[in-house]
UniProtKB/Swiss-Prot annotation:
The 2 HXXHC motifs are conserved in ustYa family proteins and might form active sites. It comes from Diaporthe leptostromiformis (Lupinosis disease fungus). A motif (HXXHC 1) lies at residues 151-155. Pathway: Mycotoxin biosynthesis. The keyword Membrane applies. GO terms for molecular function: oxidoreductase activity. Its main location: membrane. Pfam families: UstYa (PF11807). This is UstYa family oxidase phomYd'. Keywords: Glycoprotein, Membrane, Oxidoreductase, Transmembrane, Transmembrane helix, Virulence. UstYa family oxidase; part of the gene cluster that mediates the biosynthesis of the phomopsins, a group of hexapeptide mycotoxins which infects lupins and causes lupinosis disease in livestock. Within the pathway, phomYd' catalyzes the desaturation of the Asp moiety into 2,3-dehydroaspartic acid (dAsp). The pathway starts with the processing of the precursor phomA' by several endopeptidases including kexin proteases as well as the cluster-specific S41 family peptidase phomP1 and the oligopeptidase phomG' to produce 10 identical copies of the hexapeptide Tyr-Val-Ile-Pro-Ile-Asp. PANTHER family: CYCLOCHLOROTINE BIOSYNTHESIS PROTEIN O, YALI0B05434P. It is a single-pass membrane protein. One of its GO terms (cellular component) is membrane.
Amino acid sequence: MEKFFSPSRHNYADLSPTDVPASEESDEALEEKQFEYFQQRQHRRLVLVNRLLAASTVALVMVSLWLGWELHTAKFGSMGSFPYGFKYELEAAKKVIKLEEYKFLGSPIFLDDGTELVPEPTPGPMKTLGVTDMYVGEPSKELDWNWNQLHWDHCLNHLRQMILCQGDLTPIPSKYYRGITDNYIFGDMPHTCRNWDSVREFITDRFNGSSAVPLAPGTVLSDPYKKLLGILDE
């Protein structure tokens, strides 16, 4: 029986310090996998952040370019612009363009009794010297002429306003003609203008069309004005 149970007859494996149980190996492998997963997750987040930053940068650049183009178009469009000069205006003069707000004065006003008051076109005391003799008195050709002249001046003043407000700087050169041995203004030059047909259509519709502004209550129309409105036969 000793030969079966003798300790000397059995081989025992030595457990060296480097030998690790299977359960501990699985724990280390799990931890390693978790660490690798964490690293991959962090990497994906970093890639996502970088992509978002890159996309944001590209979007910001695109918006900046678009805004720059819009400003460029407004300033240097195909036809130019009012504050920076139109296409056919003199280049050297464009740099002196400055915008300002200006109120023109001198429009006639009418009192309830029909009296017409014509103030001076510029601020200051009224110049009444000689006005009574020019526009008031016995009917005469001279008196009628003075009133007509005043009406013409009023119309010319409106033309002056339009010229001053537009301030067209398109050069109008002179051209030499042998027949007269002199220079003469050559006005056949292109200008940047508003389409008058469109403006006229708007004015007509605004005056007597679907977009007409209603008259103030109590307004009494004269026959010429009624003809303009089309509510009085010729």
